Amino acid sequence: MIDHIGVSVSDFERSVEFYKKALAPLGYELIKSFAGVAAGFGVAPKPDFWIGKGDVKQHVHVAIRASGRAQVRAFYEAAIAAGGKDNGAPGVRPHYHEHYYGAFVTDPDGHNIEAVCHEPFLG
């Protein structure tokens, strides 16, 4: 089981503000910050998604599980409003499996951030 992940960002403050807004609909909040160097987000009390000031040498793809399709849509809307770029609007992705519902947004550094729900739509 993965405990946490870290992602390099070129502009730390800009990325903190982006992730505070983009991840809020998923229940994530800024839990820990180290003076302009690193910040940890997650569902309290434990951060599991970290960003750190550094060179962005390659882009990563991170998927965060959502509790339902509405939460996926809320993530997408919040991330776009926070300055993210569309990389796949909310929708079913049957090539993964019949209930895979995800949305993809690139952050200010081009990292592909996804919210995903694996549950069938119940109406």
Language-model features: locations:
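N-terminal beta-strand motif that seeds the catalytic metal site of vicinal oxygen chelate
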Residues: M1-V16, V62, E119-G123
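Core segments of cupin and vicinal oxygen chelate
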Residues: V7-P47
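Vicinal oxygen chelate
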Residues: D11-E13, A63-P108
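A short linear hydrophobic-aromatic micro-motif
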Residues: G27-E29, W50, D86-P90
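Long, continuous compositionally biased terminal/linker segments
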Residues: A39-A81
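Short beta->alpha transition motifs characteristic of CBS
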Residues: H97-E98, F104, A115-L122
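Glycine-rich acetyl-CoA-binding "A-motif" of GNAT/NAT acetyltransferases
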Residues: N112
